[in-house]
Every structure is written in structure tokens, then in C-alpha cells.
Amino acid sequence: MILQRDSDYSDGTVLGSMCTEPHPVAAEAFVAGLHVNLGDPYLFPNAYRAERECIGWLAETLLDHPAPEEAEGSIVSGGTEANILAAYAAREVTGGREIIVPATRHFSFEKAARMLRMKLVEAPLRSDYTVDVDAVQDLISRDTALIVGIVGTTETGSVDDIEALSDVAEDHGVPLHVDAAFGGFTAPFLREEYPLPRFGFDLEAVVSVTVDPHKMGLVPPPAGGIVFRDDEFPKAIEVYAPYLSGGGASQYTITGTRPGAPVLALYANILELGEEGYRRIAFRCYEETLKVAEKARELGLELAVDPPHLNLVNIRLPDRGTAERLLRESEREGWKISVSTKPLGVRIVMMPHLDAETVSRFLELVARVLGG
């Protein structure tokens, strides 16, 4: 079989991925929806209705929308497409050409800027790798189309102060987009017990949020999500396809044909897990993360963000040579790891397929490499 030599989440060796083994219910629903094209809603009205319900659930349960029935959005190919759509809509609504992004932004914003002929204006970071909000305020210009904040940066899992960013954005009349591709399914629950900021539509300046079901939503890829506060921004990028079944339909996603399988998988998970199920998963992963962080400290390893904001631990590495040596030793022992560049470190993403006991064995390898 062609996949025999590919990675398998179930053996606990995949340490750097933000995807994980799908929930069995989601996998079953995904297969059942293989034939569904959401780009043709007349042919698949119930799948389209399921997508509407998923967007409403995300808006209400995760994103604190005061009127979730007004939310618009789509399940798209991933966080990259979602972020591009957010930038595209902001450009069309505001007429601006600049996007203020943290230095920790996802590479999808580079793609968005190139595709949309926009300019990224980079804001510096604080010591915990969150964006410097005062610096963001100083960077706002008449050409600012969008400010971006992140809930769960790719390299350190840091959570920007979205509440403070919203205040700045509101004061200057600039839209705020939140990239919660990683943290969107966990931060709303962890905030109940840990000091994390609000980041949803209860903040006035937030106009759009990226949240990825194929990460902590336990849905098979491709399943990103873009949720807009209302229809103002998506209507600015809407296109009508007149030749579709039933007399045509409007859409604002980049792709015309869209797989329905990820939507049905998310819908199934919402029914199976619901708010309480996702809450349990979030806390279990974060509690395992804290155990890993404690083990790292015991071994004398330095965490880039301590304590971790979300279920991601980044262990600092002293130089590129050490990083390359760790990559070689990890591969030799069967670990699949990811090295970050800002800061230089090894990322351990505590997804549901991992536990602290397994990861502790890898930490001992890190300690040996750094000590040798």
C-alpha cells in the first residue's frame, strides 16, 4: 500500500503537526460525503444547510457572537484560504492596501499580500512572542485595511492580546481579523480557568475570525473555517455563478467547487462531541502540555513561552548546528519533529494523539543533544 511508509499519528511519534487523527464519527461522515459539492447548493441543499449550522455553532459557541444568526462564513480548504479571504474582503470594503501583522504571522499572509497586491506592515513582538499593541497603534495609517491578531501562533502557540488590539482598532476605525486557526477550538474553553483574552465577536472591532476544524476540531483535512461578523465583508467579494443547477448561486470562497465531506465531518463532531466534548479535549491536551513543560524544566531545558499559552511547547535551541543535530538524532530514533526559526527551537504540539509520558522520552533526547 502506498501509505505504508507515511507517518501515523497513532504511534505517538508525530510531535510537530497541528493536525491529528480525526474523530471516528468525523471520518465516517467524511466518507459518506465524498460525492458532495458545496459549490452547487441546489443539488445538495441539506449539506449546504449543515454548513450554515456549523458556521452558526462556531460563531455562537467558540466566538461569542452576540447575534450568531447574523454570522456568515464558509468551511474552506484551510487557514490559508480563510486568511486570504479575510484580507480580500477588508481590501474591498476599506479600499486600504496595508495589513498590519505580528512578526509571528502565518505564511498565508505573505500569500495574501502577493495575490492581492497588498503590503504587509510588520509589528514587533513582546518577550512572550505576542504582538506589541502599542507598536501596532503607531503603525496605523490612512492606507490600513486590516489589523491581524493571532490566537495560537504557529511557532510558539502564543496568544496575542486581542482585547487590546480591538480597542486600538476601534479607536482608529480599522477592521480586526483574528487568526485563531490553531487556538479557536481550545482558547474559548481554557479561558474559563487560565488567563487568556477574549477574541470573538463580542469585541466590537473583530470583523472576521479564522478557525480550523482540521486542527483541534478533529476533522479530516481539508477543513479550514472563515467566520464573518455579518454579510458586509463577504458580500464585497461575492460572485454570482449563473449556470449552476437551480438557476445559479452566489459564493465568496476562492474555489468554486468545494468538498462537502469536511462540512459533514464537522457537523457530525458537533453532534457527537458538542461544547462539552470539545471542552474536555481542550483541557486534556493543555493539562498534558503543562506536564511536558514541567518535565522540560526538570531537565534544564528552556521554554520560549513559559507557561505555554496553549497546547504547544517550544524548547529553545542554542544554534543552528544543535538544531540540525537534533533533527538527525530525532529521525534516527523515529521522532517526527519541527524546528522553529523565530525563536530557534523545537516545537511540540500536544495534539490529542500525544501524551506527556510519550513526549517525556523525546525530551530526554533533547537534553542529551543539548548536553553533548
Swiss-Prot record:
<dbReference type="InterPro" id="IPR020931">
    <property type="entry name" value="MfnA"/>
</dbReference>
<dbReference type="InterPro" id="IPR015424">
    <property type="entry name" value="PyrdxlP-dep_Trfase"/>
</dbReference>
<comment type="function">
    <text>Catalyzes the decarboxylation of L-tyrosine to produce tyramine for methanofuran biosynthesis. Can also catalyze the decarboxylation of L-aspartate to produce beta-alanine for coenzyme A (CoA) biosynthesis.</text>
</comment>
<comment type="similarity">
    <text>Belongs to the group II decarboxylase family. MfnA subfamily.</text>
</comment>
<dbReference type="InterPro" id="IPR015421">
    <property type="entry name" value="PyrdxlP-dep_Trfase_major"/>
</dbReference>
<keyword id="KW-0663">Pyridoxal phosphate</keyword>
<dbReference type="GO" id="GO:0004068">
    <property type="term" value="F:aspartate 1-decarboxylase activity"/>
</dbReference>
<keyword id="KW-0456">Lyase</keyword>
<dbReference type="GO" id="GO:2001120">
    <property type="term" value="P:methanofuran biosynthetic process"/>
</dbReference>
<feature type="modified residue" description="N6-(pyridoxal phosphate)lysine">
    <location>
        <position position="215"/>
    </location>
</feature>
<dbReference type="GO" id="GO:0015937">
    <property type="term" value="P:coenzyme A biosynthetic process"/>
</dbReference>
<dbReference type="Pfam" id="PF00282">
    <property type="entry name" value="Pyridoxal_deC"/>
</dbReference>
<dbReference type="InterPro" id="IPR015422">
    <property type="entry name" value="PyrdxlP-dep_Trfase_small"/>
</dbReference>
<dbReference type="GO" id="GO:0019752">
    <property type="term" value="P:carboxylic acid metabolic process"/>
</dbReference>
<comment type="pathway">
    <text>Cofactor biosynthesis; methanofuran biosynthesis.</text>
</comment>
<protein>
    <recommendedName>
        <fullName>Probable L-tyrosine/L-aspartate decarboxylase</fullName>
        <ecNumber>4.1.1.11</ecNumber>
        <ecNumber>4.1.1.25</ecNumber>
    </recommendedName>
</protein>
<dbReference type="GO" id="GO:0004837">
    <property type="term" value="F:tyrosine decarboxylase activity"/>
</dbReference>
<dbReference type="GO" id="GO:0030170">
    <property type="term" value="F:pyridoxal phosphate binding"/>
</dbReference>
<dbReference type="InterPro" id="IPR002129">
    <property type="entry name" value="PyrdxlP-dep_de-COase"/>
</dbReference>
<comment type="pathway">
    <text>Cofactor biosynthesis; coenzyme A biosynthesis.</text>
</comment>
<keyword id="KW-0210">Decarboxylase</keyword>
<dbReference type="InterPro" id="IPR050477">
    <property type="entry name" value="GrpII_AminoAcid_Decarb"/>
</dbReference>
